[in-house]
Regions:
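Mixed-charge, low-complexity intrinsically disordered regions
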Residues: 1-78
């Protein structure tokens, strides 16, 4: 499983950018969730399961997508 960088800038496979604030743990199930904020429009905050955040794009559903990761960590050169 890919490591999540807190404070990292990520690009969603559809092209929009998000800032990862933290990784949180569900109090009952123990499941990990990524807490992140969109960097456009009203800058809403979201949570998504860690497993889904680090998953690859469904190439059958999105056959023309160029980015294989659902969310890709951006380096300073991207």
């Amino acid at each position: 499983m890919r490591k999540i960088v807190k404070g990292g800038l990520y690009r969603h496979f559809k092209g929009m950018y998000y800032y990862v604030l933290d990784v949180a743990t569900h109090s009952e199930s123990g499941e990990k969730f990524v807490v992140y904020q969109k960097l456009y429009d009203n800058r809403d905050m979201y949570i998504r399961s860690l497993a889904m955040f680090v998953s690859d794009v469904d190439c059958e559903k999105y056959p023309d997508v160029e980015q294989k990761e659902r969310f890709k960590l951006m380096s300073g050169r991207d």
